[in-house]
Design a protein with these regions (language model features):
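Protein kinase catalytic-loop region centered on the HRD/HxD motif
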Residues: 120-132
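Activation segment signature within eukaryotic-like protein kinase domains
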Residues: 116-117
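Conserved N-lobe loop of protein kinases adjacent to the ATP-binding glycine-rich P-loop
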Residues: 31-38
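Protein kinase glycine-rich loop
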Residues: 15-22, 27
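AlphaC helix of the eukaryotic protein kinase fold
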Residues: 43-67
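Activation-segment/catalytic-loop signature of the eukaryotic protein kinase fold
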Residues: 79
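Conserved short submotifs of the Hanks-type protein kinase catalytic core
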Residues: 83-97, 101
Length: 172
């Protein structure tokens, strides 16, 4: 299935607009018809759904992120597979990636940067306390809300500290 506006996944999540395109898939804004809320739906690229390794990484992202309950981590609500597609339903975080803010504003004031670092560290500490290692912390994976709260996103290559990694050393 190729994602498009007005497609409904799982009989529940109606896609409304594409928010972003990444290496493993697309993120869409969607309406949850059951709960009446707006969510983000990350859809794995079709070319990867036939690859058991990629599909397992995507499932692992859903499982691993769902373990977390912290205000600095975007919540995962659901996961599904249908019509040769896999998707992850999560909190739609208002705001912009830190990478976009840096592009737009240039050098940020040190106190603001320190605030972002402290919030990110707290969110990662919560992940680490549950044995989850993010492995891809970068400005593009930190969403900054309008009131300067940080939400860590994209645990796509995260792993549980006690598990064998799904990627070989040196691969992303």
């Amino acid at each position: 299935m190729r994602p498009a506006a007005d497609i409904t996944l799982g009989g529940r999540y109606t896609l409304t607009e594409r928010i972003a395109i990444g290496g493993m898939g697309e993120v869409w804004k969607a309406r949850d018809k059951v709960l009446g809320r707006i969510v983000a739906v990350k859809i794995l690229k079709e070319e990867y759904t036939g690859d058991p390794g990629f599909l397992e990484r995507f499932r692992a992202e859903a499982r691993n992120t769902a373990l977390l309950n912290h205000p600095g981590v975007a919540n995962v609500f659901d996961y599904g597979e249908e019509d040769n597609s896999a998707y992850l339903v999560m909190e739609l975080v208002p705001g912009s990636p830190l990478s976009s803010i840096i592009e737009r504003e240039g050098t940020l004031p040190p106190d603001r940067v320190l605030n972002f670092i402290a919030q990110t560290a707290r969110a990662l500490a919560a992940a680490h306390s549950q044995g989850l290692v993010h492995r891809d912390v970068k400005p593009g994976n930190l969403i900054i809300t309008p009131d300067d709260r940080v939400k860590v996103t994209d645990f796509g290559i995260a792993r549980l500290a006690n598990q064998v990694p799904l990627t070989a050393t040196g691969q992303v």
